[in-house]
């Protein structure tokens, strides 16, 4: 089984979602199915079919999260250090064309949220930065052409 790197926060988020699905959503949908069954004929019971569909979705989510947790390689980024960019690093960069600065934390695929400044380890920018240090320039192929970014700072937050 291939291990997937994940931050402590990412693991906790998954674990909380799994608990919510198992303790809140699953019992609620089971109750909805029982209620719909009590209405009689199941062949034309839209409430029953909707609840069964929701149950299938919930069970799929539970299985998916359990798989992610089983494959998780949880990394506490606050215990990491070094000058090189690697998983968990918070990296400040400047776009060499626009002089626009940005700051990203490199996280696992399911944790990525660009709006929150978290980019996936498998993203083109992350792949370009891995192993690089402050002062180095990385080039990233984008739909609009090649973009160059200078690494300004590497932090472990």
From Swiss-Prot:
It holds the Pfam family GreA_GreB_N. InterPro entries: GreA/GreB_C_sf, TF_GreA/GreB_CS, Tscrpt_elong_fac_GreA, Tscrpt_elong_fac_GreA/B, Tscrpt_elong_fac_GreA/B_C, Tscrpt_elong_fac_GreA/B_fam, Tscrpt_elong_fac_GreA/B_N, Tscrpt_elong_fac_GreA/B_N_sf. The keyword Transcription applies. GO terms for molecular function: DNA binding; RNA polymerase binding. Keywords: DNA-binding, Transcription, Transcription regulation. GO terms for biological process: DNA-templated transcription elongation; regulation of DNA-templated transcription elongation. Signal peptide: none annotated. It comes from the Bacteria. NCBIfam families: greA (TIGR01462), PRK00226.1-2 (NF001261), PRK00226.1-4 (NF001263), PRK00226.1-5 (NF001264). HAMAP family: GreA_GreB. Belongs to the GreA/GreB family. Necessary for efficient RNA polymerase transcription elongation past template-encoded arresting sites. The arresting sites in DNA have the property of trapping a certain fraction of elongating RNA polymerases that pass through, resulting in locked ternary complexes. Cleavage of the nascent transcript by cleavage factors such as GreA or GreB allows the resumption of elongation from the new 3'terminus. GreA releases sequences of 2 to 3 nucleotides. This is Transcription elongation factor GreA. It comes from Caulobacter vibrioides (strain NA1000 / CB15N) (Caulobacter crescentus). The gene is greA.
